[in-house]
């Protein structure tokens, strides 16, 4: 996972056989492609696909957005590692002495974002905004890398996905383990904060390992048991449990 600070976010994806975006942008244009003559493939029948206009306004669903955000807040409050409206400086103080990979979720101080993911890295605490659009949450990125970033129905699902990915890479016994999922770069959380460009060579490996639980949000024994059950069972409905207990498990179907 590479995290780079700068005025424009840069998403670096390191995969076998795949080149980073900046390398693709430096390629010289090749020879122009000549169109095939008509009837070159008589057995193929092409169908015209209607092209949707980019200027066509998207259909908004305020009720769906409200339900999605309310569900996310409910999950975060149950998690114990949602710190609410603390600032970036306060998050830095909490994570400064924690081991690498410790993270928390807090409210973003930027008016265009709801949440921010604060993570302890090898270079210190780093902040990554979480953007919301079309009833989905994803890590903040620029326009070019946005199609590569996965979207999730809530923030806890997003965090759990990257924690599982980093854990799988850590446990890999292969001599050349696959690169961890690329997370977008850190940005200043408040508008107007100074941005110092950092070259790609000084990129920071950003990994998510364990959440930093608030002391004031000490998780109950019931919740801890629920986490263990969620880690061991994929489908709660298959368990012979009373309805009340099954409903409690469904209220927080996560492992963190």
Swiss-Prot record:
Keyword NADP assigned: no
Keywords, in A-Z order:
Growth regulation, SH2 domain, Signal transduction inhibitor, Ubl conjugation pathway
Residue span of region Disordered: 168-190
**Pathway participation:** Protein modification; protein ubiquitination
- Asked if the Swiss-Prot or TrEMBL record annotates the protein with the keyword RNA-binding, the reply is no
Q: Name one GO biological process term.
A: protein ubiquitination
Q: Which CDD domains match?
A: SH2_CIS, SOCS_CIS1
Where's the SOCS box domain? 207-255
- Say which domain of life the source belongs to: Eukaryota
Q: Which GO terms describe its molecular function?
A: cytokine receptor binding
Name all SH2 domain ranges: 81-162
Q: PANTHER family recorded for this chain?
A: CYTOKINE-INDUCIBLE SH2-CONTAINING PROTEIN, PHOSPHATIDYLINOSITOL 3-KINASE REGULATORY SUBUNIT
How this chain assembles, per its entry, is: Stably associated with the tyrosine-phosphorylated IL3 receptor beta chain and tyrosine-phosphorylated EPO receptor (EPOR).
Q: What does this protein do?
A: SOCS family proteins form part of a classical negative feedback system that regulates cytokine signal transduction. CIS is involved in the negative regulation of cytokines that signal through the JAK-STAT5 pathway such as erythropoietin, prolactin and interleukin 3 (IL3) receptor. Inhibits STAT5 trans-activation by suppressing its tyrosine phosphorylation. May be a substrate recognition component of a SCF-like ECS (Elongin BC-CUL2/5-SOCS-box protein) E3 ubiquitin-protein ligase complex which mediates the ubiquitination and subsequent proteasomal degradation of target proteins.
Q: What is this protein called?
A: Cytokine-inducible SH2-containing protein
- Species the sequence originates in: Rattus norvegicus
Q: Kindly list the organism's lineage.
A: Eukaryota, Metazoa, Chordata, Craniata, Vertebrata
